[in-house]
């Protein structure tokens, strides 16, 4: 099978639709050191590490939260930043059976983020 993926993207690109897209973009920058800017007239293209996440304001589309697994350098510090930015802790950081250190938070828009530091396997 042959397909074309635009430069800088992956085959699958998650998209989150929320009421206040600008605030979610600010949250992502604060918590994950994301890059990219809020765009009011198109989906905002936000990068977390090597991945692209599209963030849209509700309107033509209804709100739709996401459940995402994100690898970071320091799961504890990233979870703490998320809590400081208004997220709710769903699971304290712990050592998973497969080796990742992972915590879980829900952001103010209902998105769930599993935040992990890779295991040493």
Go through each PLM region and give its residues.
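Short beta-strand-to-loop elements that line the ligand-binding cleft
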Residues: 14-16, 37-38, 92-95
């Amino acid at each position: 099978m042959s397909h074309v993926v635009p430069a800088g993207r992956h085959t699958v690109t998650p998209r989150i639709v929320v009421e206040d897209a600008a605030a979610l973009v600010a949250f992502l920058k604060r918590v994950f050191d994301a890059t990219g800017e809020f765009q009011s007239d198109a989906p905002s293209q936000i990068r977390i590490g090597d991945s692209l996440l599209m963030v849209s304001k509700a309107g033509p589309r209804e709100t739709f939260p996401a459940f995402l697994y994100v690898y970071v350098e320091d799961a504890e510090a990233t979870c703490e930043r998320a809590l400081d930015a208004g997220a709710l802790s769903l699971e304290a950081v712990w050592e998973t059976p497969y080796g990742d250190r992972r915590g879980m938070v829900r952001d103010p828009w209902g998105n769930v983020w599993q935040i992990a530091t890779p295991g040493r396997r």
